Amino acid sequence: MELPLSQAQFSGTFLMLAVSNMLLWEKVSSIPACLAEEGGCWNPIVETFNSAMQRGETLRNLADQLYTELYHNQFSSEQFLALNSKLIRRDKTAVRAGTYCHSTLSNSPDGETKHADVETEKYLKMLINFVGAWISPLYHLVIELSAMQDVPETILSKAKDIEENKRELLDDLKWILTKVYPTAEMKEEFPSWEHLSFLKSSNKDSKFLAMFNLSKCIYNETYYILFYLRTLKCHITGKDC
């Protein structure tokens, strides 16, 4: 039976709407998990990056405070000023402790490269190993400080807070990796810290040499962490570029 023209047009329009809705549904269902909220969309990956960056800011402030405290508190100021003086005189041991950090970072991922996504995955893994490199040294720092006499609570509490924030930042980065690259294989390669034996030594000067190295490295490297977090957030989420 031939349909009247108006009815045929209506049926055709209905079919087009149905197909359009189906395609729209397929497109929406392919978008990564994003929870609808009033005023926009809540993206867990973006929020985890925001959380990681907030921890990075906290680490920078804590590292700055610990660094300053160790230089000016009576507990450690004499040893730190002596080490700084040796550093200026180019004493080999002091130069090594004052300028060398066992964790290193390469250049940031290049967004113009043909394999930008591969590069981004690579640098996310590298940042995980970079942050993870300080988990063990900070753990031992807290243990050794807790066992030393006359340790100011301000120094011990900051060391504990830095360790806690490092662990939480590492958890954030690992979570991002599993969500953005679910099939990625992550091999944790945390380099050993050469000053660990100094920190665990019964010799007080050796302990302070290790703290001199750790505090300088933690202080300087928080800036790199924040830079890499911003770069990776831009590459992965397209936000805050």
From Swiss-Prot:
It comes from Rattus norvegicus (Rat). GO terms for biological process: cell surface receptor signaling pathway; female pregnancy; mammary gland development; positive regulation of lactation; positive regulation of receptor signaling pathway via JAK-STAT; response to nutrient levels. GO terms for molecular function: hormone activity; prolactin receptor binding. The lineage of its organism: Eukaryota, Metazoa, Chordata, Craniata, Vertebrata. Pfam families: Hormone_1. Glycans are attached at N213, N220. It is found in: Secreted. This is Prolactin-8A9. Belongs to the somatotropin/prolactin family. Disulfide bonds join C34-C41, C101-C217, C234-C241. Residues 1-30 form the signal peptide. CDD domains: prolactin_like. InterPro entries: 4_helix_cytokine-like_core, Somatotropin/Prolactin. Detected only in placenta. Keywords: Disulfide bond, Glycoprotein, Hormone, Secreted, Signal. GO terms for cellular component: extracellular space. The keyword Membrane does not apply.
